[in-house]
């Protein structure tokens, strides 16, 4: 899997989980302690996040990092 497609799949997984929980990008960003632009860029697959950012997002979405990556990998 190429790096750009990995980022795109990860972003789609985060977007799907966020919308399932009825969270806006702004709300998720606030809960995770990151800027709203980071969430938007991540969901579009144009941001390469740190593990700490992914961990914060996963925690607020109620999933583990493993679940987040498995969901993205299955796309």
Residues covered by each model-derived region:
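Short, charged recognition helix plus adjacent turn
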Residues: 59, 69-75
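Short alpha-helical DNA-recognition segment
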Residues: 22-41
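A detector for short, charged/polar N-terminal pre-domain segments
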Residues: 1-9
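Short basic helix-loop element that most often maps to the first helix and adjoining turn
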Residues: 12-27, 56
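Short, basic-rich loop-to-helix N-cap that marks the start of a DNA-contacting helix
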Residues: 46-56
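Residue-level detection of the helix-turn-helix DNA-binding "recognition helix"
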Residues: 19, 33, 44, 73
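Short, conserved catalytic or interaction motifs in soluble domains
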Residues: 44, 63, 70
């Amino acid at each position: 899997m190429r790096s750009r497609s990995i980022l795109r799949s990860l972003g789609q997984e985060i977007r799907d989980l966020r919308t399932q929980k009825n969270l806006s990008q702004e709300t998720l960003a606030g809960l995770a302690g990151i800027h709203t632009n980071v969430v938007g860029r991540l969901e579009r697959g144009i941001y390469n996040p740190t593990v700490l950012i992914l961990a914060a997002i996963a925690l607020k979405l109620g999933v583990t990092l493993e679940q987040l990556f498995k969901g993205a990998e299955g796309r």
